[in-house]
């Protein structure tokens, strides 16, 4: 999903999410990119205010009838699913095709190399906080399993810490959950 989860400040993350949504929607036209639009249902156990990102997704609607037990409301909308192994390979090919070069180095802080490169792409994951001297970056633990594809839409219950989700992909489905900070 393109909207930020457990992130802040909302003004910035919503703007990033909106721009990302628009770009990824365009990229769905290229089947090799590994991105598809999917109908998404996010379920809640209590009434919700309008989400700050509702105007940035397609076909947003609020559902209050015919919901699974224990749920009183659901947001329905279109968003993208990115199959990361496919997408990252596609991005790397584009990068190389545009003349980009990869250089593998061991870095303990970005300040060590900031003068050597005009652009540094930080995709270090859990090491981000350490490399960027940002003490507010922390890991969030999750668990997933992959199964044969059964449905074509995404289902979410993102109420921390009992997070649960079903994400369809081209050859499998991801079943996941848990959101334990630290």
Model-derived regions, located:
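Flavin (FAD/FMN) cofactor-binding and adjacent substrate-gating region
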Residues: 19-98
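A conserved short coil-to-beta-strand element within the FAD-binding core of flavoproteins
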Residues: 100-115
